[in-house]
Amino acid sequence: DRLEGGKKIVQFADTMKMSTYLVAFVIGRIEASAPTSVGKTTLRLWTVPGKKHLTAFGQDIATASLQFFERYYGIPYPGDKLDLLAIPDFASGAMENLGAITFRETALLVDRRTGTHGELERVADVVAHENAHMWFGDLVTMSWWNGLWLNEAFATLMEMLAVDAWKPEWKRWDSFGVSRARALSVDGLHSTRPIEYPVRAPKDAEAMFDVLTYEKGASVLRMLEQHIGPTVFRDGVRHYLETHAYGNADTKDLWISLGKTAKQAVPDVMDGWIFQPGYPLVTAELTQRSELVLTQQRFTYLPDPAPGLWQVPVSFRIQAGEKTETRRLLLTRAEERVA
């Protein structure tokens, strides 16, 4: 509605309940792609004029990943529209504003005909990561910044699941361990930190946006998924999201939900990985009596031993003649002997 003096009133549709840090307004000369639909959700990509021809690939993965997450989480996308906006000179890689995700242009726009595989993979990963946040982070938000890993580690794991389902020929799980090598290199330092630690000042929260939160966090979640089984893990995630929808949660709440479906004490396995720094170096040795001896100690670059004990899911294969047997155990002590 236009008023006197060149003023006008703009009315916006009501939004769903959201955390204050997820509110965003994008104002400027921008153009929208043709919409696609996922259930009742209208999905569009937005760019500055002249770049709309670069939206097709991003729109494909945005649509595919949104469909994937609705199936995986068992919960429809909690809104009626989803806009993905390419912003020139955007400071961050992307930001999961609820219903209006903002991206650096290189993280959303690419020509599928001329883009390198690395460029296509980056767009797919970032778009899937941000869409995953619509549930982990947006539908359920961490209680405080010490729980940031609940947002970012889960979104990193979920991006891998979604992209692998969309483009299995990319073999993303084959490269998963390699791409997490940066976290291992940092976590071997004496100065490393736990995935979760107390946040008392803004600088503490800012320091959490690193490879330990994203890469190490996603790696230990993948380890847990493989330990309790993908279906049990997924059902625990669904319970967590359903229980805490439109609210706040912390690490303890996640363990409770996963424990209900796994029927085991998840904190016993996972707290060491989340709340203590570093990671274990597991060594296997076969004795002359055909005993397998497994030992663990914290890995460090320096020769000085560092304290630390983890519960480590271990799989090993035994071959006797033509018979092959795969066994699993949970290494809970510094040394374990298997006959």
Where are these regions (language model features)?
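Short, ordered beta-strand-loop transition motifs
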Residues: R2-K8, P35-G39, E285-S290
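Hydrophobic residues positioned within well-ordered beta-strands of beta-sheet architectures
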Residues: V10, L43, V312-V314
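Well-ordered beta-strand positions in beta-sheet-rich domains
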Residues: I9-Q11, A100, T326-R328
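Extended Gly/Ser/Thr-rich low-complexity repeat segments
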Residues: T20-A34, D304-V314
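Short, intrinsically disordered, charge-balanced linker/junction segments flanking boundaries
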Residues: D1-R2, V178, A334-A339
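Hydrophobic alpha-helical and helix-loop surface patches within well-folded domains
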Residues: F12, E31, T42-Q297, Y301-P303
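Extended, low-hydrophobicity, Ser/Thr/Pro/Gly-biased non-transmembrane segments
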Residues: D1-I30, F57, T295
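Beta-strand-rich binding/interaction modules
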Residues: V266-P267, Y279-A339
